[in-house]
């Protein structure tokens, strides 16, 4: 009963969040563990700048034509807070954002309309997202008024480009200037960036130290602070602290956001806690099914690693939510292996066909053994023979176990000619005969009346190669690989 009440309560909370978020895919893509500022939250109220929204729609129509973009901007003469709002709304289109920012920067240089610190901060952020760190640094130096938002923007640019040392050093420089003439001081967003930085580096003690410092400075943490802590614990596989942080949010002043629940879903999937994962998924199912392919992939992996009795059905259901064009190579291989272990030859061969069509190559023994074992258990020797030929043509790794499976299956059906042809195929693939290869031949012939001369031939070959063996009795059945 308690579990049912927890689930109902959770679904109720998430439903409210989904209503607030309006289900916008482009907005919710910003809900990563590394969001630093409140303005990047879908719950942030921008003031309803209709002018910026209308201008954004005009610019989107001409986003592939820099000349027309400039013409639209010239007609509207936008700057200051309205320009910052426009760049905020253009965030899902970084290339267009860069064109718009370049226009504003040129206006400042040519027409003497100085840019504000917030405009520079947006430009630095855009450059960071486009992996142009040099431009981001140039804009930082160009900004005469280095406010907290300007420092945060460059720290964020360093962070998203993997320049952790530069990010850390910039914070130290920023922090050391508090006693100088500048009145700018680190904000909660500054510390959020540091928490995210140390979380990515799996430096949990430093991450927690930054959070403690934040509290000692009486700076109130926000949802991004806790989300970045949770993300750090997920990186470090510290599931207890992940869950403790989540519960502290539920019981505290800063309540979980949709981003928090998505993080917890990932954490439960990674930890293999299927019960909690399924509860969390049901709560955010509508959003996840539409927008979160990576989370769906994480859940598929969680079921794959588990011994859940209904895992095949659940994996099949989840995989249908991913568009075929979005399938990653590893997902084809995982699904191939899942259906192989379930002896579902039709589904397995369907994914084999797709993998070959897409030019994927398998070089892993485990996957090949799973496929061969599935054909073996289903006694589908002709299908296995066809698969061997197709796998070879596709450049997949050929192993001795594949040919051993063919030999055993042909032998069990007394198709001796085809069984012996397998030996020739092995030679063509430069796969040598092992003791096991000869043992398979010996047992097949010994189990068949009238094949004593073949038994003697194989026994002679084994002695020639120095293999010890016991002559099997004729009554023995053909044994497995």
From Swiss-Prot:
GO terms for molecular function: mRNA binding. PPR repeats lie at residues 147-181, 187-221, 222-256, 257-287, 292-324, 328-362, 364-398, 399-433, 434-469. Keywords: Repeat. InterPro entries: Pentatricopeptide_rpt, PPR5-like, TPR-like_helical_dom_sf. This is Pentatricopeptide repeat-containing protein At2g48000. Disulfide bonds: none annotated. It comes from Arabidopsis thaliana (Mouse-ear cress). PANTHER family: EXPRESSED PROTEIN (PTHR47874), OS05G0407900 PROTEIN (PTHR47874:SF1). Belongs to the PPR family. P subfamily.
């Amino acid at each position: 009963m308690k579990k049912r009440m927890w689930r109902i309560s959770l679904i109720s909370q998430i439903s409210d969040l989904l209503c607030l978020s309006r289900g916008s895919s482009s907005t919710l893509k910003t809900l990563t563990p590394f969001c630093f500022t409140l303005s990047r939250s879908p719950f942030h109220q921008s003031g309803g700048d209709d002018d910026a929204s209308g201008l954004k729609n005009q610019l989107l129509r001409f986003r592939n034509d820099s000349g027309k973009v400039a013409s639209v901007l010239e007609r509207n003469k936008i700057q200051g807070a309205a320009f910052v709002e426009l760049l905020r709304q253009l965030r899902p289109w970084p290339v267009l954002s860069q064109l718009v920012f370049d226009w504003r920067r040129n206006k400042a240089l040519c027409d003497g309309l100085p840019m504000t610190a917030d405009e520079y901060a947006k430009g630095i952020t855009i450059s960071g997202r486009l992996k142009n760190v040099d431009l981001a640094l140039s804009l930082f130096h160009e900004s005469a008024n280095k406010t907290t938002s300007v420092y945060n923007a460059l720290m964020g640019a360093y962070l998203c480009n993997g320049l952790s040392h530069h990010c850390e050093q910039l914070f130290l420089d920023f922090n050391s200037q508090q006693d100088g003439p500048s009145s700018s001081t680190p904000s909660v967003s500054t510390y959020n960036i540091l928490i995210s930085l140390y979380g990515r580096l799996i430096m949990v003690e430093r991450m927690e130290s930054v959070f403690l410092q934040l509290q000692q400075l009486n700076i109130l943490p926000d949802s991004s602070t806790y989300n970045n802590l949770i993300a750090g614990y997920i990186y470090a596989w510290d599931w207890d602290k992940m869950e403790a942080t989540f519960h502290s949010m539920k019981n505290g002043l800063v309540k979980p956001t949709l981003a928090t629940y998505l993080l917890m879903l990932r954490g439960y999937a990674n930890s293999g806690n299927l019960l909690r994962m399924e509860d969390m998924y049901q709560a955010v199912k509508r959003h996840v099914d539409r927008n979160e392919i990576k989370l769906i992939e994480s859940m598929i992996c969680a079921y794959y690693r588990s011994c859940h009795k209904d895992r095949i059905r659940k994996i099949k259901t989840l995989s249908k939510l991913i568009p075929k064009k979005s399938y990653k190579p590893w997902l084809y291989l995982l699904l191939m292996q899942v259906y192989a272990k379930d002896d579902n030859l039709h589904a397995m061969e369907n994914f084999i066909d797709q993998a070959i069509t897409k030019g994927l190559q398998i070089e892993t023994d485990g996957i090949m053994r799973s496929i061969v074992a599935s054909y073996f258990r289903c006694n589908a020797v002709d299908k296995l023979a066809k698969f061997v030929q197709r796998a070879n043509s596709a450049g997949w790794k050929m192993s001795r176990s594949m040919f051993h499976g063919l030999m055993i299956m042909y032998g069990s059906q007394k198709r001796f000619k085809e069984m012996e042809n397998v030996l020739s195929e092995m030679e063509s693939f430069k796969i040598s005969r092992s003791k096991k290869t000869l043992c398979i031949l010996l047992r097949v012939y010994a189990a068949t009346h009238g094949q004593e001369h073949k038994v003697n031939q194989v026994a002679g070959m084994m002695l020639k190669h120095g293999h010890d063996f016991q002559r099997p009795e004729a009554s023995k059945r053909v044994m497995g690989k």
